């Protein structure tokens, strides 16, 4: 533990780890700003955001698990020169997680009220939660695909690309929330979060496709 770390190892660790660390810090900062904006709509809105995030974990925790496994799988096969095997693993993971995301989207959009009633009893809180689940439901499948694609790119050592895309589009939630919030109220903030997730995965998947073509 006290031995000197070789410089080339340290550089490699920092090259892969620092972009991801910055992305995590940026996401936390943006979430705090959005929470401050949401708090202006009352306690029900804040509660909906917090509980909604826990409900969403059904989809993103699953996708995150696949992303972690895919990261190791892609890195192993890329290092061994078995790029075709890595591509097959990515496609299989993408289909699995995509179908799961679509299922969660369908549940959120089609039966939001029974889900909301599990966590809330006040009519206003239930109504706010129902709107949240419907709007966020449109982005669940996209979010699952995004996390899986990020896992694949990270396995190739392209963490900087993933972080730049994620920070750029996640940051766009703030001005978009201000604009849509002024027009649609609280629902505008939900739409800002949902729409940026959809755009993020579209762009990330495009860059991943370009990366795979050059392997």
Give, region by region, the residue ranges found by the protein language model.
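Hydrophobic faces of transmembrane alpha-helices in multi-pass small-molecule transporters and flippases
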Residues: 2-33, 58-62, 66, 133, ...
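Short alpha-helical transmembrane segments in multi-pass integral membrane proteins
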Residues: 1-18, 74-139, 180-208, 212-213
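Short runs within selected transmembrane alpha-helices of multi-pass transporters and secretion channels
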Residues: 63-68, 136-155, 161-176, 187-203
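Helix-terminus/linker motif at the lipid-water interface of multi-pass membrane proteins
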Residues: 25-54, 58, 76-77, 114-123, ...
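Hydrophobic alpha-helical segments, especially transmembrane helices
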Residues: 16, 24, 51, 55-57, ...
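Hydrophobic alpha-helical transmembrane segments of integral membrane proteins
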Residues: 10-12, 28, 45, 58-62, ...
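Small-residue-rich hydrophobic transmembrane alpha-helices
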Residues: 35, 49-112, 143-165
